[in-house]
Structures are given as C-alpha cells and as structure tokens.
A protein has these predicted regions:
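Catalytic histidine-centered segment of alpha/beta-hydrolase-like enzymes
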Residues: 270-284
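Catalytic nucleophile-loop/oxyanion-hole region of alpha/beta-hydrolase
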Residues: 79, 105-136, 141
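Active-site glycine-rich loops that stabilize anionic/oxyanionic intermediates
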Residues: 67, 74-78
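Short beta-strand/loop motif that positions the catalytic acidic residue
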Residues: 232-233, 239-241, 245
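Conserved alpha/beta-hydrolase
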Residues: 87-110
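Conserved alpha/beta-hydrolase "acid-adjacent" motif
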Residues: 246-252
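Hydrolase active-site cap/lid region
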Residues: 160-218, 267
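An N-terminal hydrophobic leader/cap segment in hydrolases
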Residues: 1-51, 57-60
Length: 304
C-alpha cells in the first residue's frame, strides 16, 4: 500500500510540475531582437505592427517589390532577428519582407491562453500574411512564407487552412510528423528545464515525457494536416533539414514530407538551424533554385 501511495504521489507531482513547465515552454522568457536590418546595410525598412485576434505582433518591413512578398518566422524562445540572414537573402532578390515576432515572443503581445495555442500561432501567420499582401503588396503578388524550427508548424498549418493565399512555403529544420517530436527533440538536445528533485536520469525522463505530453495537449492541434486540406495540394513546398539535427531529426521531417506531393526535401550536412551557416553555399543554391521555379510558374500563370 505504501509503495502504491508513493507511486501515485510521484505521478501526481510529475503531472503538476509538467503543467507549469509546458506552459512556460509555450510562453518563454522573451528575447528582444538583438540585431536590426540596418546592421546589414538595409536603409529602406521600418517597424510595423500587425493586428491579430488578441493584440499586436511587432515586426520589421523591408521594402522591395510589391509583387514579391515574403513572410519570415522564427524558432521558439527566439525573436525575428534570428531569421535576419534568410530575410536579407530574400530582400536581395527583390522581395518585400516582413519579419515578425510570434505572440509571447520578442516585442509582440502576451497571450496568457493555456489551451488552443497551435490555432493562435497559426492565426499569427495568417494575419501577418494577409496584412503583408493587403497593405504592402499587389493583389496578385507572389507570397512566400519561410518558417524556421517551431514556426514551421504553424506555417504549414496556415497553408492547410487556405485562407491566407500563401503561394509557396519554405521550412527550415521542421516540422516533424508528430507535435511531440519537437519537444522531445529539445529535451534530447539538452534544452529541458532543470527542476530540483528531478536529477536522476529516470525521473528527468519521466518528467520530460509528461511535459511533452502536456505541451501537445495545450497546442490542441490535429496534426499532421491532411494532404488534401486547404491549399496543400497546390502549394510548392521546400523543406530543408540537417543530417545531424538532434532536435528535429531528418527522418521525422521525411515522414512528414512523404505525405505531400508538392513537397521537396533537401538534407544538408549540418545540425538544427545550421544550414545557412555551415552549408551556406548549398543552402542558398537550393533555396534560389526553388524560388526561381516558383517565380517562373507564378509569372506564367499571368501574375506580375
């Protein structure tokens, strides 16, 4: 009886700690942008706000062509400045680029919601894309979304919803076939919370499993999106993964991309979010080839 009571008490403690830790994981400590477009020599840019369902998203707009638009996301716990390198490349190709902080990140609004969080992040992508097209582009502009790590999940979900008129999608270091894969990957890579009393490998592993489970519950998403849903069947998609990515293993990304006929998968010799750094030439060669193909098709269809 005492053993059973102790086991139940241990399980209850793990569930309690996991609830707090999962909430904190999806509402991370903020990191304000640490670099700005002007640090890269861009003069024609400004700060803008995107109105969303519960507040405002803070962003930077890099002015370019009105018929070439790009929305750029970031990883969990980071801010828009983490994706400046990719944004600068797109801007040099002539794109008008919007980098923005997801809710609960950077300088965007705080959303204290504890459930339905995946839907809210997807709404961020949709609202930012719609604002970019309506206020800073032409009606028939090519609109590209580039997501990295965590933001690849809501970016793909936004294409599946089909309301944001996304013409092409690039995903760097994600997403995987399961929502739980992202969180377990973080923990496997050593980014799990250090909780007093959970120092043994066994207790820590049990806690991390519980945190991942509770985080998935809080996201509240049906994943992965069905191949025929929304615009998935018509939208060209490029997925870039790293062969040594221990947060989002390439096998997990491949299991997802195998579901979609319009998906192209490129595997580089690098880790998580390291492709544009460690394999820079090939990373941007693959990206440029994809963009050229997308732009050509868009033009042939009668768009600008």
């Amino acid at each position: 009886m005492q053993i059973n009571d102790a086991s139940r008490g241990e399980a209850a403690m793990i569930r309690l700690v996991a609830r707090f830790a999962a909430f904190a994981l999806l509402h991370p400590r903020r990191r304000p942008p640490h670099r700005r477009p002007s640090d890269h020599g861009v003069a024609d840019w400004r700060s803008i706000s995107v109105v969303t369902d519960r507040g405002r998203l803070d962003g930077w707009l890099l002015h370019g062509r009105r018929d070439r638009l790009a929305l750029v996301g970031h990883g969990i716990g980071l801010s828009r400045s983490a994706s400046l390198d990719q944004a600068m490349h797109l801007h040099r190709r002539g794109y008008t680029v919007l980098l923005f902080d997801l809710r609960n990140h950077g300088r965007s609004h705080r959303d204290p919601s504890g459930t339905g969080i995946a839907d809210r992040f997807t709404t961020d992508i949709e609202q930012a894309a719609q604002t970019l097209r309506a206020d800073h582009g032409s009606t028939d502009a090519l609109l590209l979304v580039l997501g990295t790590s965590f933001s690849t999940f809501p970016s793909l979900a936004a294409v599946a919803r089909g309301s944001a008129r996304i013409d092409a999608l690039v995903c760097d270091s994600g997403p995987g076939l399961t929502l739980d894969s992202l969180f377990t990957g973080f923990f496997r890579a050593g980014f799990g919370p250090r909780v007093p009393g959970f120092r043994s490998p066994e207790r820590r592993a049990a806690l991390y499993r519980a945190i991942a489970s509770d985080a998935v519950r809080r996201l509240g998403s049906s994943w992965p999106p069905e191949p025929a849903k929304g615009d998935l069947a018509r939208t060209p998609m490029l997925f870039i993964t790293g062969s040594t990515d221990d947060i989002m293993p390439p096998s997990e990304v491949r299991r997802l991309t195998d579901r979609y006929d319009t998906a192209q998968l490129v595997t580089l010799d690098c880790g998580h979010l390291r492709g544009n750094k460690d394999q820079r030439e090939r990373y941007y060669t693959e990206l440029d080839a994809f963009l050229t193909a997308v732009e050509t098709v868009h033009t042939d269809r009668g768009a600008p």
